[in-house]
Amino acid sequence: MILVQLAAEEAQNPLIPEVPELVIGLLAFAIVFFVLGKKLLPNINKVLEERRAAIEGGIEEAEAMKVEAQSVLEQYKAQLAEARHEAARLRQEAQEQGATLITEMRAEGQRQREEIIAAGHAQLEADRKAAAQALRQDVGTLATDLAGKLVGESLEDHARQSRVIDRFLDGLEEKAEATR
């Protein structure tokens, strides 16, 4: 009776389930837990493991990429330093070649200037000699004509005329040199 009374009291309490309901609920929970544990939980664990592996792989890959990027950066810096060194060397060579070229061009200009001056002096000397020769002939002709008029005889003989002119001009040159 006590059990009946307890059962009657229990029926009255809605918070305490009846034993058959409790057993059925526990069995259903165990079946659902077993099915979830055998079927769903391995899939969830598999997905979580794949995600963890992907994250770790991503981290490892990021670390490897960081190391590779650092290596590439060092190579870039080394190449940049080498390029700067090469540019400085080429600039120095260009300056040296430019200085050499300027020196050569100055020497060539000096040589050409000397040649032009020498040619000018030679031309002046040739012109002076030609002018002196022309003057000598003109003075000789005038002197012969004047001498012929003074002497009263013709100095038409060419050989005689040349001798007289030469003597006259030689005398003038001697006087000119004596006055200097």
UniProtKB/Swiss-Prot annotation:
InterPro entries xref list: ATP_synth_B-like_membr_sf (IPR028987), ATP_synth_b/b'su_bac/chlpt (IPR002146), ATP_synth_F0_bsu_bac (IPR005864), ATP_synthase_B_chain (IPR050059)
Record HAMAP family? ATP_synth_b_bprime
What's the protein here called? ATP synthase subunit b
Protein keywords:
ATP synthesis, Cell membrane, CF(0), Hydrogen ion transport, Ion transport, Membrane, Transmembrane, Transmembrane helix, Transport
Q: Name one Pfam family in it.
A: ATP-synt_B
Q: Name one GO cellular component term.
A: plasma membrane
Q: Membrane topology type, per the record?
A: Single-pass membrane protein
Compartment(s) = Cell membrane
